[in-house]
Every structure is written in C-alpha cells, then in structure tokens.
Amino acid sequence: MSYSNILVAVAVTPESQQLLAKAVSIARPVKGHISLITLASDPEMYNQLAAPMLEDLRSVMQEETQSFLDKLIQDAGYPVDKTFIAYGELSEHILEVCRKYHFDLVICGNHNHSFFSRASCSAKRVIASSEVDVLLVPLTGD
C-alpha cells in the first residue's frame, strides 16, 4: 500500500527531523504530499502572568514554533504542503485535521521522556480513534 497524503506530528525538538525524514521516504516514491502538525505551548498555563503579557507571550511562542517548522521544512529536501500549529489536546487536532484534509497516514514519534511522553499519550488516543493508518516511529535522542 502506498500513502499519498501524510500528516506528521512533530515537536519543537531535533528528533522531529527523524519523523519528517520517514515521511519523505514514504512520500517521495509516489510523489505524495506531506503536512506537519505541532503543539504550541499555551501561555495560559502560566497563570501567574498578567493578562496583557499572555497575548504577547502567545505571539512569541507562535513565532518561535513557526520558525522551527520553517527550518524543518527547509532542511527536509522535499516540499511540505501545509503546517498546522495547535493549542490544547494534540490528538483531537490530529483527528480533526485528518478528516478535513483527507490524510491517509499519520506519523507520530515514540519517545520515553519530555514532550514526547505527552505526544505518545496523544499517539495512543490517535491510534484508538483514527480512521486512517498511524505509523509510530521510535525516536533516538542525543
């Protein structure tokens, strides 16, 4: 089976390059499409900050996340069609985006700590609820 419309769930970490490389290896032979989705930190979780600072912090986090995605895409050596920056529960956004854009494969990373432990929980929810195939890639960190 070949996949032509792939959604890759990435985090703002170097290991995301491994996920995108896996997607490229699957998409390139069939000239498939790749899109990225990531979870941005929501400054509202830092409730000790004053309300006016939250919007500024949200904007900075959005810009940093977009810059990371831009660099990831630049280094991919393959075109990326769309990027999605989500807030909140990643698995819900993945399922919604899959339905809306008709992805036929979701690629997620499996890591034992930090962001990816949360992402792997999201991956479990995606696997349980997904209507498309999900590839869980073991990640090697430095």
Swiss-Prot record:
Subcellular location field: Cytoplasm
Chain segments annotated as transmembrane: none
Coarse class of the protein's main subcellular location: cytoplasm
Assigned GO CC terms: cytoplasm
Pfam families in the record: Usp
InterPro entries: Rossmann-like_a/b/a_fold, Universal_stress_UspA, UspA
The organism's place on the tree of life at top rank: Bacteria
SS bonds (residue pairs): none
Keyword RNA-binding: no
Keywords: Cytoplasm
Keyword Ribonucleoprotein: no
Functional note: Required for resistance to DNA-damaging agents.
Entries under NCBIfam families matching the protein: PRK10116.1
Family recorded in the similarity comment: Belongs to the universal stress protein A family.
Protein name as annotated: Universal stress protein C
Organism: Escherichia coli O157:H7
Upper classification of the organism: Bacteria, Pseudomonadati, Pseudomonadota, Gammaproteobacteria, Enterobacterales
Recorded name of the encoding gene: uspC
